[in-house]
UniProtKB/Swiss-Prot annotation:
The lineage of its organism: Eukaryota, Fungi, Dikarya, Ascomycota, Taphrinomycotina. This is Mo25-like protein. GO terms for biological process: intracellular signal transduction; protein localization to medial cortex; RAM/MOR signaling; regulation of establishment or maintenance of bipolar cell polarity regulating cell shape; regulation of microtubule cytoskeleton organization. One of its GO terms (cellular component) is cytoplasm. It holds the Pfam family Mo25. GO terms for molecular function: protein serine/threonine kinase activator activity. Belongs to the Mo25 family.
Length: 329
């Protein structure tokens, strides 16, 4: 990293200009090596300037000047555009640079959020990178950082690209599918009121696609989706969503099937959704009918359900409550 301490260090303007000049050259065969070196050096410079080091905090005035140059030059878009062309360490630096920029605020303003709102074309590109392992994880880290901000999360939720996560989660690559699920979860849990409104408006389509995840043959997909469903339904902001979901006979039937899944972990997660149907004081007639029809089987099954969890007081209390409610039907 001697370039950071040479006799004539690049100014912030020089660093940004160097990146803007060299990033497009990564697609050109002639003299690629020199462009890779320049981009690598400048990204390291940028990362150290914005993030500091273990020993030195970033200089506030330098960060302010550098950020201004970054926005003025449209560098964030260029970094996303040419992300697949970057070398491994440069991709890591890019992720850290975006994280630092997105967390930077001036009073109550987040300048990078404003920039991203003005350039929404960045989001489809980032989501599309989940198709390519070499950039998926950097793109995912940037998307999750964006989802921390309500205004950017709204853009993600209301774009067509949000719906592609339902297929990305089922990718054949475990690592890529897990990362996509982490982003999906961040989008759905970070801003509860906003997400409640979104799910309410898109209720039928959302749960049509979500049910596919719950029926997945992939153990990890099924378990993660089931656990997330419980978190979504138990959010206070999602009360109307929960009420509508637990009024459905089809949803109840699915949970009863999952209660008997061969995996004990999936059984356990299914119980935490199933209990909502039973505890609902205003059950729909179709839900009551199914519970009554299966009353004796449910009581017998739940009486022996996960009895090895002797030290889990909350679970045992809830299981006893559910059994008692079914007995009263």
């Amino acid at each position: 990293m001697s370039f950071l301490f040479n006799k004539r260090p690049k100014s912030t303007q020089d660093v940004v200009r160097c990146l803007c000049d060299n990033l497009p050259k990564l697609e050109i065969n002639n003299d690629k090596k020199k462009s890779f070196e320049e981009v690598s050096k400048c990204l390291q410079n940028l990362r150290v300037s914005l993030c500091g080091t273990a020993e030195v905090e970033p200089d506030a005035d330098l960060v302010s000047d550098l950020s201004f140059q970054i926005y003025q030059s449209n560098l964030p878009f260029l970094l996303v555009r040419y992300l697949p062309k970057l070398e491994f360490e440069s991709k890591k630096d890019t992720g850290l640079i975006f994280s630092a920029l997105l967390r930077r605020h001036v009073a109550s303003r987040y300048p990078t959020v404003d920039y991203m709102l003005a350039h929404p074309q960045i989001f489809p590109v980032l989501v599309s990178y989940y198709r390519y392992q070499e950039v998926a994880f950097t793109a995912g880290s940037i998307l999750r950082e964006c989802s921390r901000h309500e205004a950017l999360n709204e853009v993600l939720l209301n774009s067509r690209d949000f719906w592609t996560f339902f297929s990305l989660i089922q990718a054949s690559s475990f690592d890529m599918a897990s990362d996509a699920f982490s982003t999906f979860k961040s989008i759905l849990l970070n801003h509860k009121s906003q997400v409640a409104e979104f799910i309410s408006y898109h209720f039928d389509e959302f749960f049509k696609q979500y049910t596919v995840l719950l029926k997945s043959e992939n153990y990890v997909t099924k378990r993660q989706s089931l656990k997330l469903l419980g978190e979504i339904l138990l959010n206070r902001a999602n009360r109307s969503v929960m009420t509508r979901y637990i009024s459905s006979a089809e949803n109840l039937k699915l949970m009863m099937i999952l209660l008997r899944d061969k995996s004990k972990n999936i059984q356990f997660e299914a119980f935490h959704v199933f209990k909502l149907f039973v505890a609902n004081p205003e059950k729909s007639e179709e839900v009551i009918e199914i519970l009554r029809r299966n009353k004796s089987k449910l009581i017998s099954y739940l009486s022996a359900f996960h009895t090895d969890r002797k030290n889990d007081e909350q679970f045992n209390d809830e299981r006893a409550f559910v059994i008692k409610q079914i007995e009263r039907l």
